[in-house]
Amino acid sequence: MTIMRKKHPLIKIINHSFIDLPTPSNISSWWNFGSLLGLCLTIQILTGLFLAMHYTSDTSTAFSSVAHICRDVNYGWLIRYMHANGASMFFICLFLHVGRGVYYGSYNMIETWNMGIILLFAVMATAFMGYVLPWGQMSFWGATVITNLLSAIPYIGTTLVEWIWGGFSVDKATLTRFFAFHFILPFIITALVLVHLLFLHETGSNNPTGLNSDADKIPFHPYYTIKDFLGILILLMAFMILTLFFPDILGDPDNYTPANPLNTPPHIKPEWYFLFAYAILRSIPNKLGGVLALILSIVILAFMPLLHTSKQRTLTFRPITQTMYWILVADLLILTWIGGQPVEYPFIIIGQTASIAYFAIIVIFMPIAGMIENNILDLN
């Protein structure tokens, strides 16, 4: 078996990636989220495949086909809720994975980090298009509002929006193409994940100290396979509790009303995992400015290697920047809350303050904190 593991062309690749992979001996549970994201992606592809067998991407039958899945298909309700809540679990793991990367300075592995940002955009695009498919009120109006933002692009904006819609409004053509893209994107994401792992294995994993760990590496299997398995069990338990006991807690009641272009819901908002970006978008009165801020809220992650001023890689031994980091986390939670609130006083001013704070902490305060810590170290 060992000879086959090390000699067989295909198994050899798996061996170097998941079995004999030299891994730092001190990586904590924060490094579990990569494997959990792999599990989430697998769950989403499998449940999505079974949903696609029964779903029809036509405006007249989309809503009723989802109802049919829940009522008439064997365990259709379970497949549908696993897929819907699986997206939420996916984003929870994604945000924690990115947060770990920021905290421990993993952005210094530039190729892996940039690949991760591309993956984040791809997953966000997939989730957005998936939310449109049930063709409820929030599906329709969410699609209308978000795609309409592209009309802010000077000169070509309106033409671009109509090209994406396939007409003069969100209609049959839009739903069909969104279904096609929603189906193909997870497979593109899977390919990108392999590239992400390829880049990661070029440099090896980071660790909580941020120091070079070449002198103290252990094989991935069995040490981290068993550790990942524990993480998987915890995730699956949380996932099944969410799916079986609180399936609708993260959804919007408006989406149980069929899409009606003549009736606008009082509060149009995306799924919870987009609310922070939606709050940043709404905090700027100008349409183009809002769109740019929305894009920049994710693209700013690509600039983190340039904004790194500290002599140390991680925040483990940097209390000032640690404080800034946790203020940033709190700020993102505030933005998520504001994104779900109506556009009125005091939510407008809170959203604007939180949006300014978000960019200021990343671009100004964290780099300054790094320089202050460098000076403190020099004094010692």
UniProtKB/Swiss-Prot annotation:
A cellular-component GO term for this protein: mitochondrial inner membrane
UniProt-listed Pfam families: Cytochrom_B_C (PF00032), Cytochrome_B (PF00033)
Membrane topology: Multi-pass membrane protein
InterPro entries with a match to the protein in the record: Cyt_b/b6_C (IPR005798), Cyt_b/b6_C_sf (IPR036150), Cyt_b/b6_N (IPR005797), Cytb/b6-like_sf (IPR027387), Cytochrome_b (IPR030689), Cytochrome_b_C_euk/bac (IPR048260), Cytochrome_b_N_euk/bac (IPR048259), Di-haem_cyt_TM (IPR016174)
Needed co-factor(s): heme b
Binding-site positions, heme b b562: H83, H182
Co-factor: note: Binds 2 heme b groups non-covalently.
Residues binding heme b b566, per UniProt: H97, H196
Keyword terms, alphabetized: Electron transport, Heme, Iron, Membrane, Metal-binding, Mitochondrion, Mitochondrion inner membrane, Respiratory chain, Transmembrane, Transmembrane helix, Transport, Ubiquinone
Gene3D superfamilies the record matches: Cytochrome Bc1 Complex, Chain C (1.20.810.10)
Transmembrane intervals: 33-53, 77-98, 113-133, 178-198, 226-246, 288-308, 320-340, 347-367
UniProt protein name: Cytochrome b
Protein source organism: Microtus pinetorum (Woodland vole)
